[in-house]
From Swiss-Prot:
Pfam families: Aa_trans (PF01490). The chain crosses the membrane at residues 43-63, 70-90, 123-143, 158-178, 187-207, 228-248, 263-283, 301-321, 340-360, 363-383, 397-417. This is Amino acid transporter AVT3A. The gene is AVT3A. Changing E241A: Abolishes transport activity. It comes from Arabidopsis thaliana. It is found in: Vacuole membrane. Residues 1-42, 91-122, 179-186, 249-262, 322-339, 384-396 are cytoplasmic.
């Protein structure tokens, strides 16, 4: 997942006659400058790029816990509900703009403020900061674990730190430098590199999984039990997280009446890819499937290149994903002024959290079950219900309330399950 995938907390307009260079970049400032309206194929591609990210790497381990059939059903349920809630945001924005007569709602935060006032924007801001920071914590865990797996063949400790912790701290000074850059325009090509590596690595891993399965054929579980259902929901929600980018993507679509079709097609294709990746990974390694599937690949040339490529990808994606966090924090604490000390302190906090998390997939489930569920299910249904409260039929009110309650239930139960898994792993 990239920086522009999650941007969407607030919007800022330029005064007339001013240049885009006269103001610091914000979370919804395009990395590559102004863009023309997107055609239908480009809209589809943008949606695909905005959603596919590092969460897919934890799906095989999740299938090991949930069982392969329950894992597939969970992915189908989450993708369908995510698509429904994305369209709720689009319909809510269109409704509010039809009442005002102005196209002033360009982000999730704008929508929250339009529906619920400053409190709505505050809630979106907080959820955005937590989700983006959570994504970056998982990135650091992946990078450190991958480097330790490739370069450290023992259980040696230095100054009481294991190999993964040493590599994590080794990333810290470089991340301070990267995150000190006020404008990330020069890092934009890395975003393209990230997308290419993600897709290529996914395909390579899936092909290897097929050959390994044909050789080993390990026993597989169909259902892992009800107790792990909410754990799987959390990881799936994390993997499909991208709702913060829906409104900007719909705004730049040339054929807005066909946006839902492009969004649905992209979600369907991503669901198939995620299901195949999770299933093949679990089929290849069975109960030996690790929390980061790439660590199962061994030390061959191809597997090493895949792991290094993904690690480098996420290392340089880190500052892009943190940009919305800096926009929110600097806007609220520093009157939107650039502050290197705020950025460094934020990177330090994210690094410390990464040190405390023992398992990659468990942390994905925690982030997905908590903040991603609130952003993806709870807030869209709440905003839609509030905006259309005087027009909805009883059936539609029941649907919105049901989605809201499902989101709250997943958030509470899934968070508890993920925390329990993390504490159990830590013990």
């Amino acid at each position: 997942m990239r920086y522009d995938q999650e941007a969407g907390s607030s919007s800022h307009s330029l005064p007339s006659g001013s240049s885009s260079h006269s103001l610091p970049p914000t979370e919804d400032t395009p990395l590559l400058g102004p863009r023309t309206l997107s055609s239908q194929p480009k809209t589809f591609a943008n949606v695909f790029i905005a959603i596919v990210g590092a969460g897919v790497l934890g799906l095989p381990y999740t299938f090991k816990k949930t069982g392969w059939l329950l894992g597939l059903l969970t992915l189908l349920f989450v993708s369908s509900l995510t698509f429904f809630c994305m369209m709720l945001l689009v319909h809510t924005r269109r409704k509010l703009e039809s009442l005002s007569g102005f196209n002033s709602i360009t982000s999730f935060g704008d929508l929250g403020e339009s529906v619920c006032g400053p409190a709505g924007r505050l809630v979106v801001d907080v959820m955005l900061v937590l989700s983006q920071s959570g994504f970056c914590v998982s990135y650091l865990i992946f990078v450190a674990t991958t480097m330790a797996n490739l370069l450290s063949r023992g259980t040696e400790h230095i100054l009481g730190l294991d190999a993964a912790s040493i590599y994590l701290w080794g990333c810290f000074p470089f991340q301070l430098g990267l995150n000190s850059i006020p404008s990330l325009t020069h890092l934009a090509p890395l975003s393209i590199f990230a997308d290419i590596v993600d897709v290529a690595a996914t395909l390579v891993v899936m092909v290897q999984d097929v050959f390994i399965f044909l050789k080993r054929r390990p026993p597989l579980r169909v259902f892992g039990g009800v107790s792990v259902f909410f754990y799987g929901l959390g990881v799936a929600v994390y993997a499909f997280e991208g709702i913060g980018m829906v409104l900007p993507l719909e705004l730049e679509a040339k054929y807005k009446d066909k946006f839902g079709r492009a969004l649905g097609l992209a979600m369907g294709l991503i669901s198939i890819m995620y299901g195949a990746f999770g299933l093949l990974g679990y089929m290849a390694y069975g109960e030996e499937t690790k929390d980061i599937i790439t660590t199962n690949l061994g030390t061959g040339v191809v597997s090493t290149l895949v792991q290094l490529g993904l690690a480098i990808n996420l290392f340089f994606t880190f500052p892009l994903m943190m940009q919305p966090v800096y926009e929110v924090v600097e806007r609220r604490l520093c009157s939107s002024r650039y502050s290197v000390w705020v950025r460094w302190a934020t990177v330090l906090v994210v690094t410390l959290v990464a040190l405390l998390v023992p398992n990659f997939a468990d942390f994905l489930s925690l982030v997905g079950s908590s903040v991603c569920v609130v952003l993806g299910f709870v807030l869209p249904s709440l905003f839609h219900l509030q905006a259309f409260k005087n027009e909805l039929s009883i059936t539609r009110i029941v649907v919105d309330v049901l989605v809201f309650l499902i989101g709250v239930m997943i958030a509470i139960t899934g968070t508890w399950t993920a925390v329990h898994e993390i504490l159990t792993s830590k013990a």
